[in-house]
Amino acid sequence: MAAARVPLWAICVRRVALATVYFQEEFLDGERWRNRWVHSTNDSQFGHFRLSSGNFYGHKEKDKGLQTTQNSRFYAISARFKPFSNKGKTLIIQYTVKHEQKMDCGGGYIKLFPADVDQKNLNGKSQYYIMFGPDICGFDIKTVHVILHFKNQYHANKKSIRCKVDSFTHLYTLVLRPDLTYEVKIDGQSIESGSIEYDWQLTSLKKMEKASAEAEGWDQAAKDKSQDWEKHFLDASASKPSDWKGELDGDWQAAMLQKPPYQDGLKPEGIDKDVWLHQKMKNSYLTEYDLSEFENIGAVGLELWQVRSGTIFDNFLITDDEEYAENFGKATWGETKGPEKEMDAIQAKEEVKKAQEEDEDDMLMGRFRGRENSFKGFHRRNEF
């Protein structure tokens, strides 16, 4: 007896009890998405988004997402959710992106923002916690960005992670784990993983300079002759004679000896002092707030530039459960990726057929025009 198949949606429902889903967006309620997503008005020239499944798709409704609509524009849009901290938890960021226009230069990445981000004024200078996703420009840049904000600086992964460059929908997943390991997946397949400390070159941030520090006056010039440099110095070995009488002889002073051989411009002997090297100590800040932990995550958004528009963003997910993310990816992108390619193949065949028919028509017209010219030539020759 064959085992009964459990639908993917049922698996996802079961996982909800175990997973914390901070944000999930599939754009299945038509134009109501506008109540959740906020266009930035920071610049009147920002491009606009529309809800679309594109020219080819696996499912007309399920594949609808935010599509860029204007060429050579910056775009800025975001959605809020209940703020949370990923301290001590796994953080998964996942979404699909489709460069239907065959991207030549532009971003396809997303950003996670602090809860206090100003959505109406979102722009390229707005602070973000994480930037993740594909970026394409010409032949040189075809990369997956993974940028983390730490200690008021942005740190990029030092590894080169190649993105997909075709016009189909692809599933991008970033996993940040509390043991300071990470994983990047495309279409459910792991393409890069490793240590957050080493792959972001953050090991130096695990230690900080000790505040106590250099000897007093260390940074003052100590080599050159001082202004009070004298030719003579007191004889420290001299002692007052036993028959010295202060009442008659006055106050006794040690004899002054000449510094041999003194010349103007002579530099006194001393110890060369290099730059003071601070001792290194463990950065106590990191014990409370680690390299991939963010205290107040509260918004997700698209802030990017595109030369040629047409990209579609869909199936956004932010959660703490890797299995839930995997099942969600299968239930969304996994269900429509095949039909999408089938529709594209059908359209391609139709385009080829149409082009062939047009070529045949052109050839027939060309033959007729050729005969017409020959007839005219014949008549002209007859005239002679």
From Swiss-Prot:
Subcellular location: Endoplasmic reticulum lumen
Pfam families: Calreticulin
Motif range (Prevents secretion from ER): 381-384
InterPro entries, per the entry: Calret/calnex, Calret/calnex_CS, Calreticulin, Calreticulin/calnexin_P_dom_sf, ConA-like_dom_sf
SUPFAM superfamilies cross-referenced by the UniProt entry: Concanavalin A-like lectins/glucanases, P-domain of calnexin/calreticulin
Origin: domain of life: Eukaryota
Keyword Repeat attached: yes
Region described as 4 X approximate repeats: 191-246
Residues holding an alpha-D-glucoside: Y109, K111, Y128, D135, E303
Cleaved signal peptide residues: 1-19
3 X approximate repeats as annotated region, ranges: 250-284
Alphabetical UniProt keywords: Chaperone, Differentiation, Disulfide bond, Endoplasmic reticulum, Glycoprotein, Lectin, Metal-binding, Repeat, Signal, Spermatogenesis, Zinc
UniProt-annotated glycosylation sites, renumbered to this chain: N42
S-S bridge residues: C105-C137
Key word Protein biosynthesis present: no
GO CC terms, sorted: endoplasmic reticulum lumen; endoplasmic reticulum membrane
Region of interest called P-domain, as start-end residue ranges on this chain: 198-294
GO MF entries: calcium ion binding; carbohydrate binding; unfolded protein binding
The Sequence repeat ranges on this chain: 191-202, 209-220, 222-231, 235-246, 250-260, 264-272, 274-284
Subunit structure: Component of an EIF2 complex at least composed of CELF1/CUGBP1, CALR, CALR3, EIF2S1, EIF2S2, HSP90B1 and HSPA5.
Family according to the record: Belongs to the calreticulin family.
Role, per record: During spermatogenesis, may act as a lectin-independent chaperone for specific client proteins such as ADAM3. CALR3 capacity for calcium-binding may be absent or much lower than that of CALR. Required for sperm fertility.
Domain notes: Can be divided into a N-terminal globular domain, a proline-rich P-domain forming an elongated arm-like structure and a C-terminal acidic domain. The P-domain binds one molecule of calcium with high affinity, whereas the acidic C-domain binds multiple calcium ions with low affinity. The interaction with glycans occurs through a binding site in the globular lectin domain.
Protein name: Calreticulin-3
Source organism: Bos taurus
Gene from which this protein is expressed: CALR3
